[in-house]
Amino acid sequence: MKITSPHFGEIEVNEDKIITFPTGLIGFSDCKRYLLLEGEQGTPFWYLQSVEQEDLFFVMIDPTNFFEDYQIEPSSQDLAAIDLKESENAVILTLVTVPEQDIKSATVNLKGPVIINPDRRLGKQIVLHPSDYTTKHPLFNDQGTKARGAV
């Protein structure tokens, strides 16, 4: 199967690479199947490309690359939803918003991380309650460098 992404062009989709989000992502419950694509070499960015809606993709990061102290404890229900028993086996990513392609103004949703079971290829976006994390945490500081540990 092939899809055409406005960002990536034509992509060959291998069924065994698709990550299924049984409940979709928040605000996108109709889209349940995605590919996780690595960004350009040397960048910390990943892309979650919808298989069902070709013009839909999300910029993602491993939050610990920017926020050393970022830690979450998914509930046992959240882990069960993606067939995991231990949270340390999960891949944790967060969604990045880049306003008007201005990377220096990018924000990251630390309050709503995505957890993925890489073996079962199942994912879920969770909401951390209670949490000091925000949905629009600056990715970079005022000097345009990584906002390391700035949570």
UniProtKB/Swiss-Prot annotation:
Alphabetical GO biological process terms: bacterial-type flagellum assembly; regulation of translation
Keywords associated with the record: Bacterial flagellum biogenesis, Chaperone, Cytoplasm, Translation regulation
GO cellular component, one term: cytoplasm
Main location per the UniProt record: cytoplasm
Intracellular or extracellular location(s): Cytoplasm
Superkingdom, taxonomy of origin: Bacteria
Subunit structure: Interacts with translational regulator CsrA and flagellin(s).
Function: Acts as an anti-CsrA protein, binds CsrA and prevents it from repressing translation of its target genes, one of which is flagellin. Binds to flagellin and participates in the assembly of the flagellum.
Similarity remark: Belongs to the FliW family.
UniProt name for this protein: Flagellar assembly factor FliW
Gene that produces this protein: fliW
